[in-house]
């Protein structure tokens, strides 16, 4: 999954790509309460240590929150809902 669709109006700033960092947390799509460590999320999905170290995340530069684990999952906060007015498609090649 090299693209993600998000609710554009939930972004506070611009998007920036960076590698995952120790302690990064996000709320996986469909998880309505709490957050999960990105490292735990990747371990649960049997991602190798090598692939974990090169995992990219798209972050909101204003809030510093993870919007998308590139190629894997969007954060639940940025999901498209019935009240979404504008959809942003993010592509990473």
Regions found by a protein language model. Give the residues of each.
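Basic, glycine-rich polyanion-binding accessory segments appended to enzymes
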Residues: 1-93
């Amino acid at each position: 999954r090299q693209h993600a669709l998000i609710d554009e109006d939930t972004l506070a700033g611009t998007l920036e790509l960076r590698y995952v960092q120790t302690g990064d947390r996000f709320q996986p799509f469909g998880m309505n309460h709490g957050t999960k460590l990105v490292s735990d999320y990747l371990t649960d999905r049997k991602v190798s240590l090598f692939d974990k170290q090169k995992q990219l995340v798209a972050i909101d530069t204003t809030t510093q929150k993870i919007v998308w684990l590139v190629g894997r999952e969007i954060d639940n906060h940025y999901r498209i809902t019935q009240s979404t007015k504008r959809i942003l498609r993010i592509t990473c090649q």
